[in-house]
Each structure stands twice: as structure tokens, then as C-alpha cells.
Curated annotation (Swiss-Prot):
Component of the ERMES/MDM complex, which serves as a molecular tether to connect the endoplasmic reticulum (ER) and mitochondria. Components of this complex are involved in the control of mitochondrial shape and protein biogenesis, and function in nonvesicular lipid trafficking between the ER and mitochondria. MDM12 is required for the interaction of the ER-resident membrane protein MMM1 and the outer mitochondrial membrane-resident beta-barrel protein MDM10. Residues 346-355 have a biased composition (Polar residues). Its main location: mitochondrion. This is Mitochondrial distribution and morphology protein 12. Residues 356-371 have a biased composition (Low complexity). The SMP-LTD domain is a barrel-like domain that can bind various types of glycerophospholipids in its interior and mediate their transfer between two adjacent bilayers. Residues 83-92 have a biased composition (Acidic residues). Keywords: Endoplasmic reticulum, Lipid transport, Lipid-binding, Membrane, Mitochondrion, Mitochondrion outer membrane, Transport. It is a peripheral membrane protein. Component of the ER-mitochondria encounter structure (ERMES) or MDM complex, composed of MMM1, MDM10, MDM12 and MDM34. A MMM1 homodimer associates with one molecule of MDM12 on each side in a pairwise head-to-tail manner, and the SMP-LTD domains of MMM1 and MDM12 generate a continuous hydrophobic tunnel for phospholipid trafficking. Residues 270-286 have a biased composition (Pro residues). It comes from Podospora anserina (strain S / ATCC MYA-4624 / DSM 980 / FGSC 10383).
Length: 550
């Protein structure tokens, strides 16, 4: 069935001129992305005209739309089909579902600071139990370069400095800084105070981090410490066995116990007899944490998490003397001794264990393949729209031999007297073309999709035509068929041949004996024609198609 097309109405008026300008700009943009040969500097498209000869359109079939026409983008659907309430609801539900899945698959606790190891906490603002487990942190920690420590060895600043000076006034050496000396004296006092109040020597942090000596120059302590005769085994190991400077990752403040500074040596602490008056009273910042079951063993209850924290960031040398490690050190488990900072957060060890053992439940390759298959299926469901009974597609045979015009210029580079010496513009005018192809026009809701079929698909869609010929006069190099003189020349076309002939005229300089003065003009013509054919096939031939909103 033939269809009469009012060509003047389609291509005339302001709308027709705007459409012609859009086609001109489109072809010009495509030429700018084409790699040019060495003898062509640039190509510019100046004008496009539809001409006055309309194409012949014949309706061949009405079928269901091609599956590719149902592939849509959610964003474009939301922007272009705002009038369809049903589609809007489907799009909104799908988007909310995908956002929920993204949050769930992101991993619970992935951005939760409580899931981080204690030695990787984010300081006073993001540390474990920063304000809940241990009370308010010192505000000076925020501006400190050591995140969690504003003054090494002194929790809460220097408010308790008078306490350390009163107890260890004679033990400071001039070769060390006051802060380092205070840190060492404070740690010695903490160990003596804890041991003097009935704590056994099985506390892991006391054996892992024995009291270092920062007092004298010769390595011997000059500070008066209770039970001085029992402190001699602390110095069994030579000071040169293992030393390291305190680093940012190994210095931490415990909100309940005060601090656990790093030790330069691995020392062992012998058991001290319980004494109610064996040491000075602790400062307010070192108040004993409350334990509901056994108040005399609260430090042993919280000591192992600190040991686990330090052990993960420190490299400790073996003791030179005989080992004096208590048997309870290796038997203590984090599940029996939770970190005091984990009161308001899940246990770090349990979380890490679950993460490390969960992938072992299934094969990594099987899990990856399954996830990939699910993603592909989800992507397919997201893109394909639901088919409806009112969706339709029309198949046309379109034949054209008209006076369509395309004006462009190409700059030819002259290689004399040197390479690329000067560029000369060549004016190329496409004055007509011969076309025979099969087009597809599909309407799905408020969208119209259009494309041409390749020669093989065209024959399969409409079959062999009566006016098709297998040969004819024309340019055998290009394969274009030359129509007979006059008329539209449709009798010499081939079904699905698409662009079968392009007529072009070139102008450059002066002509001598009917020949061009430059031999590269023919190369420019062939290059331009090849690019025009390539642009048409890449942009208009299926599976490429154009979509129009109606």
C-alpha cells in the first residue's frame, strides 16, 4: 500500500528549516570526530536542504515492535512520561527498591566507627565509646596532631601534674623532657598502685607492658617507689634489647583506666603481696572502674583488650631472662573480657570474626558468578518495559532519487615547497542521491522509534521486490547504480541498498581543459562520500535507531 506524503508540509516553514539546521549541525559534528587524512586539514558543513522531490513510501507490514525498542532509561522515562501515573509509580517503586538494596548490600557496620579495631579509632570524635563508655573526652584532643592524645601520659591535660611532681619530684633527669619523665613516672606509679591494692601478677597488661624507666641517665631508676627491694626483677632485660619511640597508632587513652603508654622493653612483674597501704592514692583521672562481681579484680577484667590492642601494632622482643609469663595470659579470651569502650558498640573481635568466616561458607567463584547473574537479570528487568496491546510497528519500503543538497568545504594541504605549506578550501556540493531501503517505525506509548534495516534484514522482512535488478550501469568501484536519464531512476535500484548513488560537484581554483588544477580533489571527493555513507549507516541502520517524543 502506497502512502502519499506532503513533502512541502513536512520540510517547509519554520519547523522544516529548524529540522534542516539540526541535520546540518549533526553532520558537521560527526565530521569533526572523523580522523582526517594527511592531505585534508578540516571539513566544515555549511548548509543542508531537503529539496523538492519527495520519497516514495510503501507500507509492507504491521507487526509488534522490535525488542530493542523496549530498552529504556529510568531517568528519561521520568522526564518524558510525566503524564502516565502508572509508569511514574512503577519507576518510583523501582528506584526506592534499588536504593534500599544498595544500602543493605553496602555492609552493615561498614561505616560504623565501632567496627574499627581499637588502635584504628578516629580519635575523640569517632573513638569507640567516645562519650558513652568513658564519659566526656578532653576537648584538647580535637586539635592535637595525635588525635587521641593531647599530652602524652597525662589524661585530661595537666590537671594532675602536681600529683606526679609530689610523688616523683626527685626522679626527673635533665636529659629528658618533663612530659616523657612524667609519663614514665605515672606508669610506674600506676603499676605500683595496682599491685599494692591486691591485684595479682596475672594481669596481662602488666606483663606485656612492664613499667619502663625514664628516670636516670644510667638506666637505673632514681624515683622512690614502694617495695623498692621487689622492683629489681623489672630490669632483668638489658635496655638495648628492643626500643622504639611511641607512635601515634600505639598511644591510646582508655576512658576508664587512664592510659596505656608503649614500653621500650619487654619486662616481667613478679607477684606483689596485697597491701592496703602499699602505694599512693590514685589521682581523680585514674579512678578504679566499677565491677559488680569482684571489685578487687576489675583491672584484670579489662586488661586483655588493652593487651590485644597493643599487640596488634607492636613488635616485641623476647625476654633475655627466664620467662615469667603467667598461664592465664594465653587462656584469656576477648569474649570473657570485653573492652570497656564496647559498652555502646558491638564487640570488635566478634564482628571481625564474622566477616572473616562468612565468605568461607560458599565458594568465592560461585558467589561471584551468582552475584553477576543476579545483577545482569536485575539490569535486564530495569531496562525492559512492559509490552502493551496498543504497541505497534509499521514496516515501510522507502525509495528516493531526489535533489537533496548538502554543502561543505574541505581544506586541502599543499606539500610544495614544503609539507603542509598552505591550505586551499575545496567546495563540495552533494546535489542528489539515490536511496532504496526498508524502514521501521514503531510507536510505544508516547515514543516513536525509527530506523532502517540492513540489506539482509530488509530482504527477510519484505521479501524480493518486482523492481529489483542485480546489475546496471554505474560506477563499479563504488557500487552505486546510475539511474536512467530523467525521472527518479527507481527502476535501477536494489532493495536494501540504502545509499546507492551520491552526486557531488567540486569547485576549486580555475579549470584547464575541463580538468581540475589539483590532483587531490578526487581524493577529497571520495573521502567525503565515504564518510557520508558511514555516518548514515552508523546512525540510522538497525540496531541504531532514533527516538522521538510525541
Amino acid at each position: 500500500m502506497s502512502i502519499d506524503l506532503n513533502w512541502e508540509t513536512v520540510t517547509g516553514g519554520p519547523d522544516g528549516q529548524e529540522l534542516a539546521d539540526s541535520i546540518r549541525d549533526f553532520i558537521h559534528t560527526k565530521f569533526q570526530s572523523v580522523p582526517l587524512p594527511r592531505f585534508i586539514k578540516s571539513v566544515t558543513v555549511h548548509d543542508f536542504q531537503f529539496g523538492t522531490i519527495p520519497p516514495e513510501i510503501e507500507l509492507k507490514d504491521i507487526t509488534d515492535p522490535l525488542p530493542d525498542f523496549y530498552e529504556e532509561n529510568l531517568d528519561s522515562d521520568l522526564a518524558s512520561e510525566s503524564g502516565s501515573e502508572e509508569d511514574e509509580e512503577e519507576i518510583a517503586d523501582d528506584r526506592r527498591r534499588r536504593q534500599t538494596e544498595a544500602v543493605l548490600t553496602g555492609g552493615a557496620g561498614a561505616h560504623n566507627p565501632s567496627a574499627l579495631p581499637p588502635h584504628l579509632s578516629l580519635g575523640g570524635l569517632g573513638g569507640l565509646g567516645g562519650l558513652g563508655a568513658g564519659g566526656s573526652r578532653n576537648g584538647g584532643d580535637i586539635g592535637s596532631p595525635f588525635l587521641r592524645v593531647n599530652t602524652p601520659g597525662i589524661p585530661g591535660g595537666t590537671s594532675n601534674l602536681h600529683y606526679f611532681h609530689s610523688q616523683f619530684a626527685t626522679g626527673l633527669s635533665g636529659t629528658q623532657t618533663p612530659l616523657a619523665a612524667v609519663a614514665g613516672a605515672h606508669h610506674l606509679n600506676s603499676a605500683a598502685w595496682l599491685e599494692g591494692h591486691g591485684h595479682s601478677s596475672s594481669a596481662p597488661n602488666l606483663h606485656q607492658y612492664g613499667a619502663p624507666d625514664f628516670g636516670g641517665v644510667d638506666g637505673q631508676s632514681t624515683a622512690p617507689v614502694p617495695n623498692q627491694d621487689l622492683r629489681r626483677p623489672l630490669l632483668q632485660q638489658p635496655p638495648s634489647t628492643h626500643r622504639r619511640n611511641p607512635s601515634q597508632s600505639s598511644i591510646d587513652l582508655n576512658p576508664s583506666l587512664g592510659l596505656t603508654p608503649p614500653s621500650p622493653t619487654v619486662l616481667s612483674v613478679p607477684p606483689f603481696p596485697p597491701s592496703s597501704t602499699g602505694g599512693p592514692s590514685p589521682p581523680p583521672g585514674l579512678a578504679k572502674p566499677h565491677h559488680p562481681h569482684h571489685p578487687h579484680h576489675h583491672h584484670a577484667h579489662h586488661a586483655h583488650p588493652l593487651l590485644r590492642e597493643k599487640h596488634s601494632v607492636s613488635t616485641l622482643a623476647a625476654s633475655a631472662g627466664p620467662p615469667s609469663r603467667p598461664p592465664t595470659r594465653d587462656k584469656t579470651t576477648p569474649s570473657h573480657h570485653p573492652d570497656p569502650e564496647d559498652v555502646h558498640a558491638p564487640n570488635t573481635t566478634t564482628t571481625n570474626k564474622q566477616r572473616s568466616t562468612s565468605p568461607a561458607t560458599s565458594s568465592p567463584l560461585a558467589t561471584s558468578a551468582q552475584e553477576q547473574a543476579e545483577e545482569e537479570e536485575e539490569e535486564e528487568k530495569r531496562k525492559l518495559r512492559e509490552k502493551k496491546v496498543d504497541d505497534m510497528q509499521a514496516v515501510f519500503r522507502i525509495r528516493y532519487a531526489g535533489d537533496i543538497k548538502l554543502l561543505l568545504t574541505a581544506d586541502i594541504l599543499l606539500d610544495y615547497p614544503m609539507p603542509s605549506f598552505v591550505g586551499i578550501p575545496v567546495r563540495l556540493s552533494i546535489t542528489g542521491l539515490t536511496f532504496d531501503g526498508v524502514g521501521v517505525l514503531a510507536k510505544i506509548r508516547k515514543r516513536v522509534h525509527f530506523c532502517f534495516l540492513s540489506p539482509e534484514d530488509a530482504v527477510a522482512a519484505v521479501g524480493q521486490g518486482e523492481n529489483e535488478v542485480d546489475g546496471g550501469e554505474g560506477d563499479k568501484q563504488t557500487g552505486f547504480k546510475s539511474p536512467p536519464g530523467g525521472g527518479n531512476g527507481l527502476g535501477a535500484t536494489k532493495l536494501g541498498g540504502l545509499l546507492q548513488e551520491i552526486r557531488v560537484e567540486s569547485e576549486i581554483g580555475q579549470r584547464e581543459s575541463g580538468k581540475q588544477s589539483l590532483k587531490n580533489v578526487g581524493k577529497v571527493e571520495r573521502f567525503v562520500l565515504e564518510q557520508v555513507r558511514r555516518i548514515f549507516e552508523e546512525e540510522f541502520v538497525y540496531p541504531s535507531y532514533w527516538t522521538f517524543l510525541v
